[in-house]
């Protein structure tokens, strides 16, 4: 009897394992004729592989697409062409995509340590309308970044700056004597730049965005260029400048309408936009994700053209842990929604709302059943009660894709004061996420370290902010410029270390931690924007190592605690910030500060 039971159990386990294996299908990209470290264009091969996977796999079946370790080259030719409207990016279409993943379930892309290298102007990876997908173990880079890295070799106050482009930079001096960068299918003229210390890779002290005028440039020797109109005494010989424009057409990874996505040990070394842009997604985990250089000996000083990671109109929980973010031209993480501006009151239940910023429109804003609230733009005060969408449709187009305006009908009557003349915004509360940002390193980047604008629980802990150049942590909210929602109600900032933030001035950088909602008319504000309860924002058990005065700036907060923090001063740089106060508070109540 015992033998029979053991046999039955063994058979049952065997069948269970077989059943699991049968539900997991593994593909290897080499099956499709693509080998690692070959010069073959990967774009059409990967496109065909994805089409085959979609055709062969049953709904719910687990699928793994593996890339044997090595380098894979993706060109525009043969890539997937799509019309994408991407939050906080240039809305130029069509977009060319190297690895386009759409309407997938239970898919894992495993690079096994591979390098995915792109050419031209492409979105390396897109993931849309997908569930339970994993991207892991690969890096993204471009053979010819659109940012031109140069090193100052001479700086003569009379003759101008002489510089040498990095070895990988292809360039020309145009017919009208302007330095231009070249790549596969693109030409760039550079108006601005960020200066890095040649030895430390820190952004050069008190430089912020620098002009790079190259009109009249000429070669004085092979790959040595004199720019007589470029004069800046701060750029001593040895300084490295990342010359750039302001365009941001293509993120490294674009995610939209996904549920339960994990990015594990993925590195973005360059993208002509943000490293990762996720919009209207639910539950995202980043573990070991990086927007970073290729190690301490990487000759590059820059990474992405904009933010490292950016989450627009997401919900569920965003987890970002154990990451490295360095050298990017904007924040390590930005979490927000988007206000629609009220441009017409149709009746007591219907408004027309509009996306206002030129880099944020064309994508879905809300759905029937979503909860919303209304804000007066001038004072950033809530008006009326929360409401619920019963119907929403694009107003200026026949479809959501590419729309800027929406007709929205609400369940309850709208407050009589809300109209198109006085400046009101609509905030979607359903599409707001909880955030955990933990165990990350942020260093040597332009602008700010992190930016959070969500009413859900936000925890920022155990991170290292090392020479972020601007504010390390910003809590914002803006219905006037970027139109990025919204108020923070439950924020904990703990056990972080801040080393010499604020070496430069950028937007909203009033202190190492800056709570800075954009409020045009603060003096007439009656309510408070951030907080709303005792300890709505808690800053505790952190270490600040700083050369300058401002540690905390706060505006329009109800419920702020600063306690058990250590503040150390150093002499690495000369204090220069206009804010000479350790703690500068404007319209803040229910506050407790103790070092």
From Swiss-Prot:
Entry keywords, A to Z: Glycosidase, Hydrolase, Repeat, Signal
Superkingdom of origin: Bacteria
Protein name per Swiss-Prot or TrEMBL: Alpha-1,3-galactosidase B
Residues making up the signal peptide according to the UniProt record: 1-22
Gene symbol of the encoding locus: glaB
GO molecular function: alpha-galactosidase activity
Function: Alpha-galactosidase. Removes both branched alpha-1,3-linked galactose residues of blood group B antigens and linear alpha-1,3-linked galactose structures.
InterPro entries for the chain: Beta-barrel_GLAA-B_II, Pectin_lyas_fold, Pectin_lyase_fold/virulence
């Amino acid at each position: 009897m015992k033998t029979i039971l053991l046999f039955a159990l063994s058979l049952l386990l065997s069948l269970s394992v077989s059943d699991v294996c049968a539900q997991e299908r593994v593909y290897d990209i080499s099956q499709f004729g693509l080998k690692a470290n070959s010069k073959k264009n990967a774009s059409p091969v990967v496109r065909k592989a994805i089409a085959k996977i979609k055709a062969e796999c049953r709904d719910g079946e687990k699928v793994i697409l593996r890339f044997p370790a090595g380098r894979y080259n993706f060109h525009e030719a043969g890539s997937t062409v799509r019309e994408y409207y991407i939050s906080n990016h240039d809305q130029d279409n069509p977009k060319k995509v190297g690895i386009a993943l759409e309407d997938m379930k239970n898919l894992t892309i495993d690079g096994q340590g591979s390098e995915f290298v792109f050419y031209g102007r492409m979105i390396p990876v897109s993931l849309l309308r997908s569930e339970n997908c994993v991207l892991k173990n690969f890096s993204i880079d471009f053979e010819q970044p659109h940012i031109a890295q140069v090193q100052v070799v001479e700086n003569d106050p009379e003759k101008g700056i002489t510089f040498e482009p990095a070895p990988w930079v292809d360039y020309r001096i145009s017919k009208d004597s302007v330095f231009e960068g070249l790549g596969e299918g693109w030409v760039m003229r550079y108006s601005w730049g960020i200066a890095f210390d040649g030895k430390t890779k820190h952004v050069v002290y008190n430089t912020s965005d620098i002009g790079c005028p190259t009109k009249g440039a000429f070669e004085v020797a092979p790959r040595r260029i004199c720019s007589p109109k470029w004069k800046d005494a701060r750029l001593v010989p040895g300084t490295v400048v990342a010359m750039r424009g302001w365009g941001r057409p293509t993120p490294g990874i674009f995610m939209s309408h996904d549920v339960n996505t994990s990015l594990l040990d993925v590195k973005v070394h360059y993208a002509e936009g943000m490293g990762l842009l996720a919009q209207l997604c639910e539950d995202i985990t980043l573990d070991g994700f990086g927007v970073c250089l290729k190690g301490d000996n990487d000759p590059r000083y820059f990474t992405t053209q904009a933010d490292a990671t950016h989450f627009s109109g997401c919900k569920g929980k965003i987890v970002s842990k154990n990451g490295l973010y360095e050298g990017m031209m904007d924040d390590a993480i930005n979490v927000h929604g988007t206000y629609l501006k009220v441009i017409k009151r149709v009746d007591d239940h219907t408004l027309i709302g509009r996306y206002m910023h030129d880099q944020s429109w064309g994508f879905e804003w809300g759905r029937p059943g979503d909860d919303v609230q209304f804000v007066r733009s001038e004072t950033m005060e809530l008006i009326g009660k929360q409401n619920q969408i019963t119907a929403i449709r694009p107003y200026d187009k026949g479809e959501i894709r590419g729309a800027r305006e929406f007709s929205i009908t609400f369940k309850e009557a709208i407050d009589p004061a809300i109209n198109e003349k006085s400046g009101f915004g609509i905030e979607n509360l359903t599409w707001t996420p909880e955030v955990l940002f933990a165990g990350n390193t942020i260093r040597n980047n332009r602008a700010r370290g992190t930016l959070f604008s969500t009413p859900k629980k936000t925890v920022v802990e155990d991170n290292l902010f090392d020479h972020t150049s601007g504010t390390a942590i910003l809590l914002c909210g803006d219905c006037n410029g970027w139109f990025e929602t919204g108020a923070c109600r439950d924020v904990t900032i703990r056990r972080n270390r801040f080393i010499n933030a604020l070496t430069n001035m950028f937007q909203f950088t009033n202190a190492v931690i800056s709570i800075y909602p954009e409020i045009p008319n603060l003096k007439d504000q009656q309510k408070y924007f951030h907080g709303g309860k005792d300890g709505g924002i808690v800053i505790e058990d952190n270490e600040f190592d700083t050369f300058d005065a401002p540690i905390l700036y706060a505006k329009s907060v109800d419920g702020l605690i600063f306690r058990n923090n250590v503040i150390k001063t150093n002499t690495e740089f000369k204090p220069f910030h206009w804010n000479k106060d350790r703690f500068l508070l404007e319209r803040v109540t229910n506050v407790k500060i103790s070092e």
